[in-house]
């Protein structure tokens, strides 16, 4: 499950919506 302040970037459970999260995902993939 996606929880507040817990960002996941895997394709099965995408939680990334805002820009900061997407940048974080790019850096952490």
Swiss-Prot record:
| Cystine pairs | 2-16, 9-21, 15-25
**Which GO CC terms are listed, alphabetically?**
extracellular region
Tissues of expression:
Expressed by the venom gland.
Identify a single GO molecular function assigned to this protein: potassium channel regulator activity
Key words, A-Z: Calcium-activated potassium channel impairing toxin, Disulfide bond, Ion channel impairing toxin, Neurotoxin, Potassium channel impairing toxin, Secreted, Toxin
Q: Where in the cell is it found?
A: Secreted
Could you say which residues form the signal peptide? Answer: none
Q: What is its main location?
A: secreted
The answer to whether keyword Disulfide bond applies is yes
Q: Which SUPFAM superfamilies match?
A: omega toxin-like
**Keyword Transmembrane among UniProt keywords:** no
Q: What else is known?
A: Negative results: At concentrations up to 330 nM, does not show activity on transient 'A-type' Kv, delayed-rectifier Kv, voltage-gated sodium channel (Nav) and both HVA and M-LVA Cav channels in cockroach DUM neurons.
Swiss-Prot/TrEMBL domain comment = The presence of a 'disulfide through disulfide knot' structurally defines this protein as a knottin.
User: Which function does this protein serve?
Assistant: Both insecticidal and vertebrate neurotoxin that potently blocks insect calcium-activated potassium (BKCa) channels (Slo-type) in cockroach dorsal unpaired median (DUM) neurons (IC(50)=24.6 nM). This occurs in the absence of any shifts in the voltage dependence of activation. May interact with the turret and/or loop region of the external entrance to the channel and does not project deeply into the pore of the channel. Also shows toxicity to mice by introcerebroventicular injection.
Q: Which family does the UniProt entry place this protein in?
A: Belongs to the neurotoxin 30 (phrixotoxin) family.
Q: What is this protein called?
A: Lambda-theraphotoxin-Ec2c
């Amino acid at each position: 499950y996606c929880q507040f302040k817990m960002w996941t970037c895997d394709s099965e459970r995408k939680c990334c919506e805002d820009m900061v999260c997407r940048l974080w995902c790019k850096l952490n993939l």
